[in-house]
Curated annotation (Swiss-Prot):
Gene3D superfamilies attached to this UniProt entry: 2.40.50.100
UniProt source species: Phocaeicola vulgatus (strain ATCC 8482 / DSM 1447 / JCM 5826 / CCUG 4940 / NBRC 14291 / NCTC 11154) (Bacteroides vulgatus)
Gene that specifies this protein: rpmA
Sorted UniProt keywords: Ribonucleoprotein, Ribosomal protein
Assigned protein family: Belongs to the bacterial ribosomal protein bL27 family.
Protein name listed in UniProt: Large ribosomal subunit protein bL27
Upper classification of the organism: Bacteria, Pseudomonadati, Bacteroidota, Bacteroidia, Bacteroidales
Keyword Ribonucleoprotein recorded: yes
């Protein structure tokens, strides 16, 4: 016989909601100024040219163009936006 009752809902429900982090616009894709490119905790990706960084380390585009990911010295990954050529 069980000496404790099967404890159900009162012991459940401690999991936090997912934060939806990660790359939102990938390399080679077009983006507009203000679009979020990467949501991250800390600087997993560093801001390159035409990229702004929010206070939660979110990277966003400052100009319209194409997203470009680069690997620099010491495997430091950065994100840039190559401006779109206006015709």
């Amino acid at each position: 016989m069980a000496h404790k009752k099967g404890v159900g809902s009162s012991k459940n429900g401690r999991e936090s909601a997912s934060k939806r982090l990660g790359v939102k616009i990938f390399g080679g894709q077009a983006c507009k100024a203000g679009n979020i490119i990467v949501r991250q905790r800390g600087t997993e990706f560093h801001p390159g040219e035409n990229i702004g960084m929010g206070r939660d380390h979110t990277l966003f585009a400052l100009v319209d163009g194409t997203v470009c990911f680069k690997v620099g010295r010491n495997d430091r990954r950065s994100v840039s936006v190559v401006p779109a050529v206006e015709a």
